[in-house]
Amino acid sequence: MTKSLEEFKKLVDAEEYFKFFELDYDAKIVNVNRLHILKKFSQLISEIDTNYPDISAEEKLNQYSLALQSAYQVFLGSSPQEQKLFKVFKDKPKNVITLTELSSD
């Protein structure tokens, strides 16, 4: 069965993407990091679409498959807090006072 971009665009869940590309994955890793994997995957897809606008649909799907593998691999070795993909991990809490701010001059 040949996969198409139209089929790809209908996918919603992380597991659907892995099955579509016939990639092995650990369900525990995906369950814990689902949103982060999909966010990273989305960023990588955007880069592919921007950098390679004229590649064939088949090559685009190949690149997307590599992007999903890459997004998944990131979270095998690091945490969402380390990756800081979402705003909540980027913003410094406003109600925190550092020790250097407490020291007297």
Swiss-Prot record:
NCBIfam families: PRK14102.1
Protein task: May protect the nitrogenase Fe-Mo protein from oxidative damage.
InterPro entries referenced in this protein's UniProt entry, alphabetically: NifW
Protein name as it appears in the record: Nitrogenase-stabilizing/protective protein NifW
Keywords noted in UniProt: Nitrogen fixation
Subunit structure: Homotrimer; associates with NifD.
The keyword Cytoplasm is assigned to this record: no
Pfam families per the UniProt record, alphabetical: NifW
Listed GO biological process terms: nitrogen fixation
Family: Belongs to the NifW family.
Organism in which the protein naturally occurs: Nostoc sp. (strain PCC 7120 / SAG 25.82 / UTEX 2576)
